[in-house]
């Protein structure tokens, strides 16, 4: 599996790009331009290249920027260029995670079709105990594997879905009907098409 990493400048305080690069044998991108030779790092190319994007850990600030399109760093700019499934693994203090602003931003990301990997409960960096720690990397990999395995379960199948109102004849003159926008039918069709 070929991976590329994008790290925010503040993320370098937690893990060095050298460590990430050593783990994947690939360079780490943190700025729009390479500090070594001035080469431009194309967020668009990353968006076209990837099969999925995983943002782990996702801070409250990053989640807020993603939800509202604040493209002030390479990570969020890359996210905004993605045409593939995006998985977000929040990691923050329990009060920050539970805050209505954070929950609202997560709801916005869900409404965009992003997959939220719920944080685990346990001891946090603040030494408090509760929900907010990033899910274990092994669990995140399991979520990705399950997602991509599920994407193939309807391959080659033909499915008929009706959308809109239905009318059932009672007799030659009367019928029973229902009002329907067809939204559920379209949602089912989209879900089947993605699998």
What are these regions (language model features)?
Residues 3-87, 94-182, 186-195:
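A cross-family phosphate/adenosyl-ligand binding-site feature
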